[in-house]
Amino acid sequence: MRITIFLLLIILASAGAYAACPDWTPQQAQQEVAALENQLTRWDEAYWLHGENKVSDAVYDSMRQRLRAWQTCFALPVFNDAPVALAAGRTRHPVAHTGVQKLNDATSLSQWMHGKTDLWVQPKVDGVAVSLVYRKGKLQQVISRGDGERGEDWTARARHIPAIPLQVTGELADSVLQGELFLRQTGHRQQQDGGINARGQVAGAMMRSTVSSVLNDLDLFIWAWPDGPKAMEARLSTLAEGGFPLAQAWSKPVHSVSDVARLREQWFSEPLPFVTDGVVIREGREPPGKSWRPGEGSWVVAWKYPPAKQITEIKALRFAVGRTGKISVVAQLEPVTLDDKKVSKVSIGSLARWEKLDLAEGDQVEISLAGQGIPRLDAVIWRPTQRIKPVPPTARFDTLSCLYGTTGCEEQFISRLVWLSGKHVFDLAGMGEATWRQLSEHHHFEHLFSWLALSVDALKQTPGFSAQRAAQLWHQFNLTRQQPFQRWVKALGLPLPARDWQALTDDKWQQLQARDERSWQTLPGVGAERARQLVSYIHHPDIAALAEWLAAQRIDGFALP
């Protein structure tokens, strides 16, 4: 539940979870902190009073942690104790909920496991924690975790959950059980399906004033039996016999970190009957229930799954001009890690999307990885009260602009160079944006093919280039002279659809110049508008000048016979 996470976040924030403090004046810091406090209060009220998840738990946790970091940065008092105040109900737990300490990695787990025996691992089921109180064999109370000491009395709703036995016998007849109410799933793969807001659905069903049909879909995973049988095996078998079979089915003894890691990976990728967000590792023997206190469960820890999404801050916005003149927006981010990948920037897309999202520096955004591990911006979570929005370029760019390295053309010019060095054109190894920018700036490239005229000695003068690197690069550049005519036409940026290059059999520049619109339309993917563009492109003065320069370099297909 959120309350335990909230208490842990105070410690994390003070330990430097967000190392960089914002560059704010004291007055601005007070305004921003107050605004975020108000937003968190609204989320808390929706969650605790109405059972509504306005944001995911991951988003909430991140923003709560961000608030604590800002308060620490500017030595501001903590006024918002909404999670504690709202979560705490009026019904005291017979045995307090301790919560679990979250470990960051295998190294931390190894340190915790050192010297311990009789260890067990369980899926960390993602639901809502409760206490079940049985007296004389009958269900007496079901209490929400709340602040760990007190919670809400959910007994009336719990009696409508078929998965909760109303009567038990034997050692369970007078017992206190702690577990997770969860939304039952069929074949849920956490790695693929994510959290699906399962926790919010459970909380909502339990907090409604009317009986919800969702209660029929709830189940219960018992993860603690304070003062029950001392041996873990005995507790699990008694629970299973008494109508709580899941703990026995999903509790596995472990002896090493590798044992835990194997099951963690297995449960992350394989189909399960519940949503999970990690694994829990616990000692088989637990202290007496009277000693349990919130935040003091030293005998149990959690190792969560890598987050599918992260909240981070936009540090800067950059406008990039592509080779065809289209302007896109790239956000520089406070670095975060997703699936072992460090993410420090994300493409926003077009100017229109940037304007629709209303993004500015300082905004808190949610980031995930799309297909092939490409960072993706999913949502704007928080906007500061004072926002900085950069002004986009005013110059007009198109498919024919910036063939020459003139002032104001730097971005599109470099984009053209990066494109022609790709596999689909010249396939120049090691020629990324940084290298092209370095060469262009140092050697003052006049146009798109100026690099072809560089000598080995000239390349040696490039800052950071060794003699070996210069020789290798010159050799690559020189080999492009042997590339077929079509590759050079592609490098010029001729706007011909990709599927039509094979149908184009021309191998002389003069042949392309001789084509009229009707001739171009004989190619399968070229219509009237594209034909007009092609004729205009080939006869543009800048293109004609570059073709003449390539002819002077005796590039095949351009040189006159």
UniProtKB/Swiss-Prot annotation:
Lineage top rank: taxon: Bacteria
E.C. number(s) listed in UniProt: 6.5.1.2
Keywords, sorted A to Z: DNA damage, DNA repair, DNA replication, Ligase, NAD
Catalytic activity: NAD(+) + (deoxyribonucleotide)n-3'-hydroxyl + 5'-phospho-(deoxyribonucleotide)m = (deoxyribonucleotide)n+m + AMP + beta-nicotinamide D-nucleotide
Active-site feature positions: K124
Pfam short name (any one): DNA_ligase_OB
GO molecular function annotations of the record: DNA ligase (NAD+) activity
PROSITE patterns named in the record: DNA_LIGASE_N1, DNA_LIGASE_N2
UniProt cross-references to SMART domains, sorted A to Z: LIGANc
GO biological process per UniProt: DNA repair; DNA replication
Similarity remark: Belongs to the NAD-dependent DNA ligase family. LigB subfamily.
Primary role: Catalyzes the formation of phosphodiester linkages between 5'-phosphoryl and 3'-hydroxyl groups in double-stranded DNA using NAD as a coenzyme and as the energy source for the reaction.
Matching PANTHER family: DNA LIGASE, DNA LIGASE B
Listed name of the protein: DNA ligase B
Lineage, opening ranks: Bacteria, Pseudomonadati, Pseudomonadota, Gammaproteobacteria, Enterobacterales
